Amino acid sequence: MSCKVRVIPKRDSNPAVLACLIAWIIFVFPVKGDQTIPQWHRLSDKPIISPRGNGWESAGTFNPAVVLRNGTFIMLYRAQDNTGSSRLGYAESTDGIHFTRRPEPVISPEAGYEKDGGVEDPRLVKFGDTYYLTYTGYNKKDAQLCLAESKDLIHWERKGVILAAYKGNWNVGWTKSGAIVPEKINGKYWMYFLGTSSDKTDQTGLAYSTDLIHWTEATREPVLPKRAGKFDSRVVEPGPPPIVTQDRIILIYNGADDRLVYRTGIAMFDRNDPTKLISRSDDPLFFPAMDWEKTGQVPNVVFVEGAAEKNGRYLYYYGAADKYIGVATAD
């Protein structure tokens, strides 16, 4: 099965640059009309990480961030206990599929904006020798987008809330899911994020910063809005940090329909103007199919948050039914 993306031709696309990207990035080459792109397939029919024990990761292990460090896949994942409080666990792998976990979380709820609810849904990006972690701080009242930094991915320094809830240009609710573009553009850092519009649907906005700590919304409306009748009619939520090519920003995102079935989409923005949407997938690349993706704490969910490339192959890590972690690719 495949899906289609409506593509606007771009004469200066560079195949040599794009060839090293994911298999489905072929659609950014200059073509006219519809271009068929392959859907992802699972590298394991079973979860690669599951809940365990009776403690901090007993109820759910899901929504992972992944980076490659010195040839090793490093994963930070959301772990939930039986009270519903979340922490971030740490795991390592040499092949990207079989992970060894640390026995204790690397981040636990400590700040007031995290108390009771916890730290949720990590995403990782690196600038220089520092890793930056965006995550949701949830205190059982508000969910807000937060930042922490680290040199070793184990010891983290909090930088606080970076986009406050209820205070956006168009967002009237919580802030979540900060996917930072891994390169500065026009002298600024850019971040796609989730906000809630006045009609109570969740959509994707864009913010910019000069220091990664103080952020300003770039627009007065979502840059990746919902679409009636599509797989993303109710929720349009950023996935992993985007991939940057010569002239494109490629954003994997998570879409939910009116029945709150979560599937995976892809959008393409102008590299020189991150607010400018060029195209997006008409149909999902990936969707719940396995029993453990359909049944869990929240049914019918695949939610991609991590992506890592090794030896020319991209692996995509996702939460399944808010309980498990899976991995997929497109080759």
Residue spans for each PLM region:
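Short intrinsically disordered, low-complexity coil segments enriched in acidic
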Residues: 1-3, 27, 262
